[in-house]
Structures are given as C-alpha cells and as structure tokens.
Amino acid sequence: MTPEEQVKILKRNVVDLISEEELLDRIKRKGKLRVKLGVDPSRPDLHLGHAVVLRKLREFQDLGHTVVLIIGDFTARIGDPSGRNETRPMLTKEEVLENAKTYQEQAFKILDPKRTELRFNGEWLDRMTFADVIILASKYTVARMLERDDFAKRFKEGIPIAISEFLYPLAQAYDSVAIQSDVELGGTDQLFNLLVGRKIQEEYGQEPQIVMTMPIIEGTDGKLKMSKSYGNYIAFNDPPEEMYGKLMSIPDELIIKYMRLLTDIPEERIEEYERKMKEKTINPRDVKMVLAYEITRFFHGEENAKKAQEHFVKVFQKKEIPDEMPVVEISQEKNIVDLLVEIGAASSKSEAKRLVSQGGVYIDGERIEDIKFTVEPDGERVLRVGKRKFYRISGGETKKL
C-alpha cells in the first residue's frame, strides 16, 4: 500500500492531525513508525470510549507500524497531585503490575500483541535526578502551560495550581523522548499534552511526533462523555446480553457516530443508514440492532451476539421474561431495599431506595413504589430491576409494612 493510501485510511474519523504532510513524509522516509499511547494503570477497566483510540492504533498495526503502549506506573505510584478532584490513591508496584496485566488482556481484544511494545515509564522517570527534572522543566514556560484551558481557568479564578501539576505534561512529553515516538494518539482532551510532546522532543534534538486526536464519545445517556464514574459506560467485559442491551439504550442521535468509530461497517452502508433515518424510511431501532450486533460480535463472537440479540427481542420487544435468570432463595421475609443490595442489584441502600422511588423495581410486572415493601418466603416471583436485570425469587409474596 502506498504512503498516500495509508494516510487516507489513517486520517479517517480523526479530529486533529498535526500534520498530514508530516505523517505522509514520515511514512515515505521511515516506512514503519512508532505509534505511542500512554495509559493510566489505576483504572484498568476499559470501555467503548477507550476503544475509539485503540481501534485507530490497530489500523496503524494493520499497516505494518508498531504500537508502543506506555503504562504510567511512575505516575500511579506517586499519586495525582491535582487539588481539583478527589486525589487518586497511590498504588504499589504490585498493584500497578496487576492492573497493567488486566489492561493488556482487554486492550489485546483490539490490538495485535505481536505489533505491540509494552513499556513502563518508571524505566526512565525513576532514573531521573533532580538536575534532570530541572533541565526538563527549563524547556517549557509557565506562560505556555497557562494556555491549557483548565490551568487558565483555575489561574483566572485564583484556584491554586501546584508546581507538580505543571510537571505532569512534561513527564508525559518525556515519555515520547524516551521511546522516540513518531506519532502519539489520544482523545481530543489530550491535545495540549500531545503538543507539549512535540516541543520537548525538539528540545532534545528529536524529530517532533505527529499528533493525532480522536473524538470522545458520549455514554449511554447521550449527554456526558462515556465514563465509569458517570455510570454511562459499556465495558469490554460486559456480558453479551448486557452489552447488547446497553447499546440498544443509546439515543438515536448516537447511532451513526458509534457506527463510524466503533465498527468496521463500510462508510457507504453507514451513509445509507444515515440517509434513510433522515428520510424516515427506516426505523432507527433496526439500525441500532445492527450496531449492537456488530459491537457485541466483535467482543464476544458470532454465537454470543446471536444469543444476545435473540434475548433482547424476546425480553424487550415481545415483553417476555427470559427463560434463564439468577435464582435467589430467601428463608425469611426481606425488605426490598435490603434484598436489592444483597443480590447485587444495587451497590448500596441509598441506590436501592432510589431505584424503588424512581419506579425501577417490579415484582411479577407490578411496580413497587414503597421502600417498606417486604418479600415473603412462600412461592416464586420474578423480580425485575431496571430494564435488563431479572431475578427469580424462591419465596415471593410481597407485603407492605
């Protein structure tokens, strides 16, 4: 494949590319590039938001390039100094290694292990002396740091910014120097840090890396970016039926965006779906089922995707309950709030109370609206929590206290 053809593929769905001319020239001159992605080992659970960048990395691999996956063990072990949010807990070296292993296992569902070089930035950052840090810090100015949106906002509002926070973009940039990256990828929120990498590489006599950013996708709520902390995420490790169901719950407005960024469906076909939905000649639900099937198939295989689709049609389109569901045995009466927590349907009593008060809990199809309801251990009932969680309760006559 010619360099021009490679660039045409690689720039697809990209937000920032600095610059296309440099990328083309670098491929022509070097052939195989070193493509960098830095990852945070304190959060090893990957979701579809991470898949956007990982899929672009896989495109580089399929074209013969090498992906350098940098695990930020140095950062994880010293903790996040930022005072803006809850401080990230410091991790031991053992915890970092375990999280890195979990991250790899999930990332390799998309990446090719044979074309992935795994590095820990503690390899070089642990060895830096204080003099080395001063030299690194001298290569960037406070004025330039304050061009970053979050720093500028906090400075304007008089919110403290620790000197150590300025060192984090520099540490990330030095990673690029250490592994001599040709390209660095990230979400659009990483643009500033990636550009710092270009500058620092130049300061150390290296050719500056090409910067490539990918869109940040909204979560299942269609409003906030996909994040575990927002509870709107779809995890790589979600069971097939849950993954399919979550995808079917996204707003119609996200269907095309998800298709472009998360599937290999040809662009011509995606454009056809987009046109037909605008013309109202196709039901968005049917297009969403194609999307849900394709993503579930990618992560769980053809057979599991088919079963997940059949389950969805049976339970949610025909309003039937599944044949198989977890069985919960109770030997004494249980308050509904306590029961939800015990079976794992809610993570806390406050969440359980919220589920009940918001009308998300049903027994035998009847909504429970009182947190004082109890379930008696005589008979069998079907408990539904939200749209997708079903439990068979052995016992089951409900009684209001």
UniProtKB/Swiss-Prot annotation:
Instruction: Report the EC code(s) recorded for this entry.
Output: 6.1.1.1
What cellular component terms from Gene Ontology apply here?
cytosol
Give me any GO biological process, just one. Answer: tyrosyl-tRNA aminoacylation
Which residues are involved in binding ATP?
A: 228
Q: One Pfam family name from the record? A: tRNA-synt_1b
Keyword Chaperone applies = no
Q: What UniProt keywords are attached to this protein's entry?
A: Aminoacyl-tRNA synthetase, ATP-binding, Cytoplasm, Ligase, Nucleotide-binding, Protein biosynthesis, RNA-binding
> What reaction does this enzyme carry out catalytically?
tRNA(Tyr) + L-tyrosine + ATP = L-tyrosyl-tRNA(Tyr) + AMP + diphosphate + H(+)
Q: Which family does it belong to?
A: Belongs to the class-I aminoacyl-tRNA synthetase family. TyrS type 2 subfamily.
Please name the gene that encodes this protein.
Answer: tyrS
S4 RNA-binding domain location: 334-395
| Extent of motif 'HIGH' region | 41-50
Function recorded in the entry:
Catalyzes the attachment of tyrosine to tRNA(Tyr) in a two-step reaction: tyrosine is first activated by ATP to form Tyr-AMP and then transferred to the acceptor end of tRNA(Tyr).
This protein is called Tyrosine--tRNA ligase
One GO term in the molecular function aspect is: ATP binding
The record's subcellular locations are: Cytoplasm
Q: What is the lineage of its organism?
A: Bacteria, Thermotogati, Thermotogota, Thermotogae, Thermotogales
Subunit comment for this entry?
Answer: Homodimer.
**Organism encoding this protein:** Thermotoga maritima (strain ATCC 43589 / DSM 3109 / JCM 10099 / NBRC 100826 / MSB8)
Q: Does the keyword Protein biosynthesis apply?
A: yes
Kindly state the positions of the motif 'KMSKS' region in this protein: 225-229
